[in-house]
Amino acid sequence: MKKAGIIHLGCSKNQVDTEILMGFLKELGYTFTPYLGEADLVLVNTCAFIKPAWQEAEENINFLKEYKENNKNLKIVVTGCYVERFEKELEDRYPFVDLFIGPGEYDKFVSLITSNGERKIHSSPASSFMYTHKMPRVLISPNFWVYVKISEGCNNFCSYCTIPFIRGRLRSRSIDDIIKEVEILVQKGVKEINLIAQDTTRYGEDLYGKSALVDLLKSIENIKGDFYVRILYSYPSRVTKDLINFIKVSEKVVPYFDIPIQHVNDEILKKMNRSYKKDDIIRVWSTIRENFEDAVIRTTVMVGFPGETEENFEELIAFIKAYPFDRLGAFTYYNEEGTISKNFDGQIDEDEKIRRYDILMSTQKEISKKLNAKLLGREFDVIIENEKGKYFIGRSWREAPEVDGVIMIPKEGSRSISIGDRVRVKIKKYRAYDLLGELV
């Protein structure tokens, strides 16, 4: 039986792609092995959003050169955003790679894998591929939580971002197709559905002439089963009162708001081509806090954007102190080829970017400690994900997979529980990002 090794890189959206491509390989008769040396085919699904991502892609591709030298029959296939972004340079850089397939060509994946065509590189900037519930999928996440990608591409065109040029314009799946996928997943025992897209709040604009996110959520609400839904990647100015009001009464959609604000200074936001101002962020933050006693608000911010002054940075720090976020991720600005901001004046020194990043994360660490301290004594339903040393590791609805902290439960003194179980946990201790609890 043919064996395939998989190297997955990048974000949650790319993870869905990896799982679909693995589904295609499984249908072709491949089984999967963690040992690349025994593989007949190795698939590397890459990211290329920012410099660290495409550098990681390059390292992983080059890592396979030795495997190819030791096994001339090994088929190396590189997919993902790196292929789309660096298409013209691939053949010269990686002569040992057999096939490059960009995200827009995944509908041809099976035929390309099984053919012996002379053309090695297949990419399509005007991407039209979108997976459906009918496509095979092999989950690489635990089988009790999953990402569901509701749209592909992006129409926002932020000045620092390459995604619209790599993934194309917004393309939404139909509500009916998404509902069928969720029904299948729930029937298989999935307890946590994470809806993702480049911008979930623009879902449906291309199909229905307006955002259809609330309509989608209403349809998901009618699906029977023991599961909950978390929405990720929401655009600040598109978190509407209708969306908030629906989540407030929903029995399925949890009040977890992932809203990347990027910055709070109006001039910086304008240069980023973000279509909102600081007051809009305050309005959304305040509306959520007013409507939910227990909402989680997560955000992502960027430091070191061209022209960001010390005063602009201090404004950002002051903001997160005044309007604290339960979770905050951050990254430094990367001056990427092909972006509008590449040619902006006021490019900031790398050491200064890192200094600002460190200050920001140190500030958020203290904020997180204070917020976590308020959770002492509270009880939550927790899904057990894995074990680590003396602890069971799990998450409640308050912790998104991979990006947030976890809840740790000591094994000693706990009754017998298994991976995938949902248990009631009382919070006894806290850290900056993780919580420690005991079974109730």
Curated annotation (Swiss-Prot):
Signal peptide: none annotated. One of its GO terms (biological process) is tRNA modification. InterPro entries: Elp3/MiaA/NifB-like_rSAM, Methylthiotransferase, Methylthiotransferase_CS, Methylthiotransferase_N, Methylthiotransferase_N_sf, NA-bd_OB-fold, Ribosomal_uS12_MeSTrfase_RimO, rSAM. PROSITE patterns: MTTASE_N, MTTASE_RADICAL, RADICAL_SAM, TRAM. Residues 2-118 form the MTTase N-terminal domain. It is found in: Cytoplasm. Residues 373-440 form the TRAM domain. Its main location: cytoplasm. NCBIfam families: 30S ribosomal protein S12 methylthiotransferase RimO, MiaB/RimO family radical SAM methylthiotransferase. Catalyzes the methylthiolation of an aspartic acid residue of ribosomal protein uS12. This is Ribosomal protein uS12 methylthiotransferase RimO. It comes from Dictyoglomus thermophilum (strain ATCC 35947 / DSM 3960 / H-6-12). The lineage of its organism: Bacteria, Pseudomonadati, Dictyoglomota, Dictyoglomia, Dictyoglomales.
